[in-house]
Curated annotation (Swiss-Prot):
The encoding gene: rplP
Family: Belongs to the universal ribosomal protein uL16 family.
Region of interest called Disordered, as start-end residue ranges on this chain: 1-20
Record's protein name: Large ribosomal subunit protein uL16
GO MF annotations, alphabetized: rRNA binding; structural constituent of ribosome; tRNA binding
Organism: Ralstonia nicotianae (strain ATCC BAA-1114 / GMI1000)
PANTHER family, alphabetized: 50S/60S RIBOSOMAL PROTEIN L16, LARGE RIBOSOMAL SUBUNIT PROTEIN UL16M
Length: 138
């Protein structure tokens, strides 16, 4: 599962996920990409689940790049604990996703195979996505 090896601080404030992705919004490594159209949070488990779905579909061919990393800790209080007494412990990590962010990239496979693999991966994710092809000259 993806998570940071070390952090300066264990806990982080909630913050607001606004705006659109100005960085990491183009196909940079592969030939095809899965781009976020919606906004939200992807947990490390969701990222891994989508990766597995893609990897199983393309079998031994091709290469996959994961362009996002879950670096924000989400804390949670235990069940049946009264309010107060400080913030809960970090439970899992998420990646904050803005519209336009490239989530995954793929190369070394045909367009039909890539499209189907990304469709299977998108079914595992809680945000709207779209299939993109690298533009000529980029």
């Amino acid at each position: 599962m993806l998570q940071p090896k070390r952090r300066k601080y264990r806990k982080e404030q909630k913050g607001r996920n606004t705006g659109i992705a100005t960085r990491g919004n183009a196909v940079s490594f592969g030939e095809f990409g899965l781009k976020a159209m919606g906004r939200g949070r992807l947990t490390a488990r969701q990222i891994e689940s989508a990766r597995r779905a893609m990897t199983r579909h393309i079998k031994r061919g091709g290469r996959i790049w994961i362009r996002i990393f879950p670096d924000k800790p989400i804390s949670k209080k235990p069940a049946e604990v009264r309010m107060g007494n400080g913030k809960g412990n970090p439970e899992y990590y998420v990646a904050e996703i803005q519209p336009g962010k490239m989530l995954y990239e793929m190369d070394g496979v045909g367009e039909e195979l890539a499209r189907e693999a990304f469709r299977l991966a998108a079914a595992k994710l809680p945000i709207a996505t779209s299939f993109v092809v690298r533009q000529v000259g980029t």
